[in-house]
Amino acid sequence: MAEHFKYEEMTDEELIDQLREGDRQVMDYICDKYKNLVRSKAKSMYILGGDSEDLIQEGMIGLFKAVRDYDCGRDASFYTFADLCISRQMYTACLLYTSP
């Protein structure tokens, strides 16, 4: 966690820029920062035949997609965009697991 100290004062947008400039440790920090959001969303959903860990994994995939696709020049904050990407990924997983 000591290595995360240098990221604590940075905005999400600055973190994304840092990651895109090659600082791979930033992704660990972002995952740690957003894990509670992912977990709270996983608690409110259900996958037939799955468990909350499956949804948490799907949520983390959504977070990775948010980091990959976020446009720092847009009006939406990264948090808002990540929240949407995480929710969509989880919702899609629920649909795929329950469809015949």
Which residues fall in each region the model found?
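Conserved small/polar residues in nucleotide/adenosyl-binding loops
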Residues: 97-100
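Extreme N-terminal regulatory/targeting segments of RNA polymerase sigma factors
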Residues: 1-56, 60, 67, 71, ...
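Structural recognition of an alpha-helix C-terminal capping motif at a helix-to-coil junction
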Residues: 54, 58-61, 80-88
